[in-house]
Amino acid sequence: MLTWTLFGLSSGDPGLMKEITAEIRTVMGNKSRPDYDDLVQMKKTRCALIEALRLYPEPPVLIRRARMEDTLPVGGSGISGGIKVLRGTDIFISTWNLHRAPEYWENPEKYDPTRWERPFKNPGIKGWEGYDPNKMSEFNLYPNEITSDYAFLPFGAGKRKCIGDQFAMLEATVTLVCT
C-alpha cells in the first residue's frame, strides 16, 4: 500500500503532494509522533492511501465457496435471473477488476485521491447506492463495503473480512506521516 501510494503521489499531480504535506504539517504542528486523533484529521493523507488500495488491491482476488445452492444477482450486466451457483462451487471475486470498473469509477485507471472526498453514483446501475463520504463512521479510517455499496473491497467484506483492516490503515497512515 505504501509503495503504490508513494508511486501515485510522485507520478501524479504535484499540487496534491503539497496539499498532503501541508495537511500533515498543520495537524502535527511541533509533534514528532501523531496520535489517533491526529490521524483521523488527516483526510487527504488517508485518501491517498485509500486510492492506492483501489488501484492495487492486495489481494487482487477474493475466493469464497458456496455453502449451499443459490442464485447470484448480476447487477447492471443485463443478464436476467442471475447466475445459478451449486453448493461447493468456488467463487472468485476480482477486486482488481471491481476497483477499475468504469461503471463504478470515473477515470478508473487514474490515481485520484480526491475522488474519496465527494459522493459518486451511477444511475445506470439499478439498485447501486454509490459512495457517500458522509456515510463513513467516525470509527472507520477508510470507506468500507457498506459506505461504497460493495464497489470497494480492499480488505474483503462481511464475516470473512480481514480482521486487521483498521490496524493496517492506522499503521500505513502513521508510516506515511512519519516518513
Which residues does each PLM region occupy?
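Cytochrome P450 I-helix active-site segment
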Residues: 8-59, 66-67, 81, 86-89, ...
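Conserved cytochrome P450 K-helix/beta-meander segment immediately N-terminal to the heme-binding cysteine loop
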Residues: 93-142
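Cytochrome P450 heme-iron axial ligand motif
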Residues: 137, 141-179
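Active-site catalytic microenvironments for nucleophilic, acid-base chemistry
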Residues: 5-12, 175-179
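Active-site proximal loops enriched in glycine and acidic residues that flank catalytic Cys/His/Asp
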Residues: 64-65, 95-96, 115, 156-157
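Hydrophobic, repeat-rich solenoid/adaptor surfaces of innate immune receptors and signaling proteins
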Residues: 2-6, 95, 172
